[in-house]
């Protein structure tokens, strides 16, 4: 594929470098760049030391990137040095931007006015001390374009070869600034050589990665123009994400590849537009009322269902019934059934789902009971054994159902997370067939 404009990302912060805080900015910025057709050369992470930050900038410049994007290090404290380092790297002086200083002062006033505990800080003398402490954030490289702050930290865009976009660390501040930053003349000039790509994502569940690899090898020979498609795959908790980038002239090749995947793996290919299973389930539950009954997942499925805005329209409620007594008292599971089959069994999962439908007057229910480990497994039911029951039908009436047992790999956290994913897909399939 032709070489496009290239960019590098520098994520700063000792807390990110040491793993205390997970980097959310690098992947997010990378996606935005790829959407624009900009090639991503490197993502680097470094601590707060100025010479380490400058070393990353010089490394990326030596790699010939057209644009560098940094995140973090824009606060008022002594270890927030990114702007100063970028100014030195770009050969520009730091100057006080009076307009930015006034904007920061107004933001501080509003923040303090909303917090009664620090009303005394509005005293003129006290406030001026605070304003002086934040003046550092109004120091910008000469000739840079300033981005209005979302918090108190403004971003800056410094023209040059490479151009540098400097953004704050908190994602809630960085993300709203991105559109303005990338539309600045300096940024647009830097990425002027980008290639226009289309990017598509397919999602599959229940297909081994080796199965997809075999189909892609077949496509290499069967699909004209396959070599013009840039394909990356990622396996996440039993789901495969396949992202394909291509120039518009290769649209026919992508369409033929998608048809081949649909023909060979139609049962596993559940999304051709990148929608997640959670999005699809939310749409399928419109006009319904769902309840959950969970043991080993301890409410994770209910949390996942209610993570979508508007979920109160269809989620009735859920029960976490860890003990056998709770299963009997809260869900009406017959203790004799548990005694005969064990708490981790398909009959108990069915009874839990039926109990949830009845208790919440729901027409849809999902039950999960299993052994997440690390203890509790037996030869007959090892760690990772999980029973599911999904039911669709009015409470008290015979329901359409899908009840099954699966052996899921991984540690306790993996098994619990995979269990919710399996449950979501069983729910999706049953509702799709409704």
From Swiss-Prot:
Pfam family, one: CinA
Taxonomic superkingdom: Bacteria
Gene3D superfamilies in UniProt: CinA-like, MoaB/Mog-like domain
Family matches, as InterPro entries: CinA, CinA-like_C, CinA_C, Competence-induced_CinA, MoaB/Mog-like_dom_sf, MoaB/Mog_dom
Classification via HAMAP family: CinA_B (MF_00226_B)
NCBIfam families: cinA_nterm (TIGR00200), PncC_domain (TIGR00199), PRK00549.1 (NF001813)
Family label: Belongs to the CinA family.
Name of this protein: CinA-like protein
Gene symbol of the encoding locus: cinA
């Amino acid at each position: 594929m032709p070489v496009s404009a290239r960019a590098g990302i520098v994520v700063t912060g000792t807390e990110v470098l040491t793993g205390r805080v997970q980097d959310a900015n690098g992947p997010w910025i990378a996606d935005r760049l790829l959407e624009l057709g900009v090639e991503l050369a490197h993502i680097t992470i470094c601590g707060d030391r100025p010479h380490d930050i400058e070393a990353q900038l010089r490394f990326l410049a030596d790699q010939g990137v057209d644009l560098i994007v940094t995140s973090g290090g824009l606060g008022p404290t002594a270890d927030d040095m990114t702007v100063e380092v970028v100014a030195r790297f770009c050969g520009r002086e730091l100057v006080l931007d009076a307009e930015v200083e006034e904007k920061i002062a107004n933001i501080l006033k509003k923040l303090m006015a909303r917090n009664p505990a620090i009303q005394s800080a509005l005293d003129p003398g006290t406030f001026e001390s605070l304003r002086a402490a934040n003046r550092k954030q109004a120091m910008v490289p000469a000739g840079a374009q300033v981005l209005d702050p979302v918090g108190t930290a403004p971003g800056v865009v410094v023209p040059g070869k490479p151009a540098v976009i400097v953004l704050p660390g908190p994602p809630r501040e960085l993300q709203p600034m991105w559109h303005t930053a990338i539309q600045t003349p300096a940024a647009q000039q830097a990425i002027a050589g980008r290639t226009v790509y289309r990017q598509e994502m397919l999602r599959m569940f229940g297909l081994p990665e080796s199965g997809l690899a075999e189909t892609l090898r077949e496509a290499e020979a069967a699909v004209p123009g396959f070599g013009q498609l840039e394909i990356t795959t990622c396996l996440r908790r039993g789901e495969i994400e396949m992202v394909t980038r291509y120039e518009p002239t290769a649209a026919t090749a992508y369409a033929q590849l998608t048809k081949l995947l649909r023909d060979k793996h139609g049962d596993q290919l559940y999304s051709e537009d990148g929608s997640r299973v959670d999005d699809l389930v939310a749409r399928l539950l419109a006009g319904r009322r769902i309840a959950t009954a969970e043991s080993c997942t301890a409410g994770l499925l209910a949390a996942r269902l209610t993570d979508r805005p508007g979920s109160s329209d269809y989620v009735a409620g859920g029960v976490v019934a860890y003990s056998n007594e709770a299963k009997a008292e809260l869900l009406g599971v017959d203790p004799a059934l548990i005694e005969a089959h064990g708490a981790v069994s398909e009959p108990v999962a069915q009874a839990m789902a039926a109990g949830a439908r009845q208790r919440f007057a729901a027409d849809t229910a999902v039950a999960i009971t299993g052994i997440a480990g690390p203890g509790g497994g037996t030869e007959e039911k090892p760690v990772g054994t999980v029973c599911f029951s999904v039911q669709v039908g009015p409470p008290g009436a015979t329901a359409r159902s899908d009840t099954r047992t699966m052996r899921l790999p991984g540690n306790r956290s993996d098994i619990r997370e995979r269990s919710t994913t399996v449950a979501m897909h069983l729910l999706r399939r049953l509702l799709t067939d409704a």
